[in-house]
């Protein structure tokens, strides 16, 4: 398995993967819209030979400054529970550190994301419409950014 940044030639395979994994096109359209808006900061694919078997996206938040949102993460059904998702999350965290990201937020299963260092208590300090036990954050900077509302990019508004 190879994990690398997406290429334009991967876009249709990413769209197909997201549609298949989520059973609808909403997440695939989200990634396309984030890309079109220039908000897609990190987009990695996991490949097995020529097949895209996983994808992770991190997008710029409007607030707090220097923050990213992890969404979506998808692994081909036949490859789930084999470490592909964990490898993508770890690679995305490394990539986020390389671009001086201060904090990453994700709305997801806390039992999954806490093993990578994500923390619900940290996320709870930041006002968000997604506040609750499934809203977690990972601090990458030496100090927490100033507390500010978590405001997602415009592409997320199109999900409603």
Residues of each region from the PLM?
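Conserved active-site tyrosine of GNAT-family acetyltransferases
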Residues: 113, 118
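Short amphipathic alpha-helix that is part of the acyltransferase structural core
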Residues: 1-30, 38-52, 142-160
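Conserved GNAT acetyl-CoA-binding A-motif
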Residues: 94-108, 121
